[in-house]
Amino acid sequence: SGANYYYLDSDGVMARSQWIDDTYYVGSSGARASNRWVWAGEDSDAPSSDGGWFYLDANGRMVTDTWRVINDHRYHFDSDGRMSYGWLTDEDGSLYYLGDENDGAARTGWLCLDYDGEYGQEDGEVAAVLSGGGTWFYFQENGRAIRAAGENTYANRTINGYRYYFDENGAMATGWVSVGNREANDATGISTLEYFGGADEGQMARGWRYLYDDPEDTDDEDFSFGPATSSDASHGGWAHDYEGGDGAWYYFDNNGTPAYLSTAAQSLSGATTRVDGHRYFFDEYGRMKSGLLGFVRADGTVVSAYFGADDSDGAM
């Protein structure tokens, strides 16, 4: 009848509000649905007994087992035609987040979710969307989350001029994290760490940063500090003390590596770091030190140097 199609059973009775051959749907008027969403409850005659949202294309056929752009949003449909939602890992291993059961649109850009990260993401699991204080993910224009290829590795991406790192589950790195798989060149392992700010920051630190987050308190389960032995006179080192609990100045190069006291330091120049024409001393945990400090040579003699009156200075 015109542009509409109707289904008649063997007795000539027109079908209404039901699925036909698990492929088409006719509405209350009996007309075949096209270019529209259809909701079906559980235990209905829908192609999936779980119910959910289904989409009928321009020819009235239910969309199945594919991605489809609808009204400028990207949706995924399973083999039964049911719209996917929540977390989704597709056949090629790409990770997406599709909102709740009444949404389904693949997210793009930054998204903060209530996610503990202990067991990864289950397909169909819905996470609460937060304004902050949760776990941040970044989804590309095609909806794919940026994430590392394997466990205990990180993928990095420059976004709006800042470098971010993401683990195998797509979670943005925060705090002190070992992301580069570098060999340590110091007494504690600080040379393998970078700093990525608080829970709602994530930018890799460069230049000077005053931090209350101590690197010894890293949440990186795959990292542990070694004992600090650089003050041993037989190795050469600095005579100084540190009281925990306070903040400290750190300096990070363009690759995010903090300045630190190298175990190879055997001289005043080797034990300090030049920044903007001045020399500074950073201890085995990367903390800048100030005041009068003594460098202990391998032969036990001490060379003293003055590094400013307080922590706001530190220049030799």
Question: Model features per residue range: what roles?
Answer:
Residues 1-316:
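Extracellular adhesion/carbohydrate-binding repeat motifs centered on closely spaced tryptophans
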